[in-house]
């Protein structure tokens, strides 16, 4: 399913807004970026030292548009996959293991 960049960014913002309130203050410093394509076929990528580190790289989460478009065949499915990806990458920020991810 193909969507405009603006529509995809809307889905990403909706996902960010769905982060539980108790975590929001810890993710305010994360830079969320939308990229067109992932050379590795990733849905998302977390880069940073994690929320428990006092100093380190500034945290950045990249969400890849084309990979999500290939994974979904409806707008609703795309929005849900973006939400899962954002929460998954935020989980990495909190140093969570795969089984602990908040989705």
Regions flagged by a language model, labelled:
Residues 1, 15-17, 75-77:
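Short secondary-structure boundary micro-motifs
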Residues 2-11:
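Hydrophobic or amphipathic, alpha-helical segments that drive membrane association/targeting
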Residues 9, 81, 89:
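Acidic-residue sensor for enzyme active/binding pockets
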Residues 10-11, 16-62:
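Auxiliary, metal-adjacent structural segments of Zn-dependent hydrolase domains
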Residues 18, 22, 85, 89-93:
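Short alpha-helical functional segments enriched in proximate histidine and acidic residues
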Residues 47-83, 93-103:
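Active-site scaffold of zinc-dependent metalloenzymes
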